[in-house]
């Protein structure tokens, strides 16, 4: 079977379904694919295909996720659905599936539940830009006023976590009825996707963001200067542009990129995704090291103290066998390097067990270029014991 060509004419976005267990996330995922398939835009997916999610390994963490794709008039979507609550937590913290937006599924019969709140908080912490709400199972609720009440509750909850609760589209429907082919409820799925098209912003492409490249290796070329190699994480760099070298020391230094090489060929510029060598003017071999980043001046700064959301690997995932406490000192692995840091647990949290997710304060022994949303692993003795994302920078 010949591979279909990926259609680039439509913009692409990654989305997912989030919400409390059994509120209908997977049924909704199946309904979206099925209803859009009727409109000739997608391949129908059965509930079973989505629910039997294969295990994936992301940084050694076992996550069950289902990926399906579908298209609307406006966009091509990659949609991720996770069967279990733990899978969501891991997925969002590790960034295994980056989401440009999400559909929050709330059962109209039950209203918001603990995981509803937790998924909204996680979405806020890991930087999901926008949420759209699907009030599911409305066929099971006869009372109009009850529906309005649930909608108000959901909006309040979103506002509590800094999402625009008053403006978020809330679509009421029944994923199951839509799957069964009920035309009125199929229309609700189309309404939902229209809301997703309109309300979830067009993702900014990595190449449009400010330039940043984590340094993987450094060497000097006699007569030409120092070359830093790595993969451009975001943005573009043109020959002759000024950059900053950030991290591992208090002071950042500025220099000019006098050459960009890829596969031994000289380029005028490089962009996100390219593996390059950047020739740096007037920089000695000792001024640059692995673990630093090259970045557009003023766009990212070095820090040692931050708050983070962390998932701690379970014993089965190759993590620790025992809990850890405040003052735990593991290595924090950012992009290309390990830095020792001290963990401070929140008040009321005595210890953290393998398999938990926790908010913690971290202080690193040397500054690293970080910002809200920067991801890292926690390692000890070379093995990964946790995965986290920076939520607040303290200093």
Swiss-Prot record:
Mitochondrion listed as a keyword: no
Pfam assignment, any one: GTP_EFTU
Highest taxon of the lineage: Bacteria
Protein keywords: Cytoplasm, Elongation factor, GTP-binding, Hydrolase, Magnesium, Metal-binding, Nucleotide-binding, Protein biosynthesis
Annotated GO MF terms: GTP binding; GTPase activity; translation elongation factor activity
Transmembrane parts of this sequence: none
Location relative to the cell: Cytoplasm
Principal location class: cytoplasm
PANTHER family: ELONGATION FACTOR TU, MITOCHONDRIAL, ELONGATION FACTOR TU-RELATED
Oligomer and partners: Monomer.
The protein's name in its UniProt record: Elongation factor Tu
Organism of derivation: Staphylococcus saprophyticus subsp. saprophyticus (strain ATCC 15305 / DSM 20229 / NCIMB 8711 / NCTC 7292 / S-41)
